Amino acid sequence: MLEYEALGEGQCRMAYLTASLDDPASAACGRCDTCAGPWYPAEVNDDDAEAAQTALNRVGAPIDPRSQWPVGMPRLGIDLKGHIPAGERHEPGRVVARLTDLGYGTALRELFAVGSDGRPLDAPVSAPLAAACLRTLREWDWEQRPAAVAWVPSLSRPTLVSSLAAGIAQAGRLTLLGPLDLAPGAAPLNRSTNAAYRLRDVLHRFQVPEAMAARLPELAGPVLLIDDLVESRWTLTIAARLLRQAGAGMVLPFALAAAG
């Protein structure tokens, strides 16, 4: 199929197909685009080109807060059901793009690829993606500008998420609170389970450090909570809940990408 797609002028597509099937009567058809020329417009007008470039350069996709606990938590021995209290939720958040998007989605898919050994690749956030993050933050129509930055610790990409959080705090002149603590014995998450199991796995995964908890009630604005990749949203839901229980006001989640 790649060879078929790459056929050029003078290489008949129909002749290619019939020759591949050992047809002794294979001959140029005279009608396909390589024989008769493209039947579709081959030029793009300036307005369409500008619209396409604008779409490719677009940043910002929403992270909606979860409003209910998954069904079945009591069966796992966890007493959570019904609505998540409003005072424990995060506000609507943002990612730069979804992994399925064109434009920045391409760079983000490369960023979250794994190496030849099957392990996640970890490096500081690149300058182009850092600039896209700052654009996303500038275009965010939040009710109140954040006053501080905290981040979700990562076992797979610790350098990426810490560099992202530190860079945003420096650029925005925000207080850098640091990361949440990982609970002792925390292991890489199993991302193939359903919502109830995902929540179970992150429910006691994080802790608010004492030094951070002491500063939260004194902040003059929301906490910007940084993560690298949003998948089920349960990690951000629980991390924000911990921050709010520890005295934070609004929590605004932000990440590089969302899966799906």
Residue ranges and their predicted role:
Residues A28, R145, G247-M250:
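Short loop/turn motifs at secondary-structure junctions
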Residues V152-L155:
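Structural motif
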Residues I168, G172, L243-R244:
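Hydrophobic alpha-helical packing residues
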Residues E231-S232:
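Activation segment
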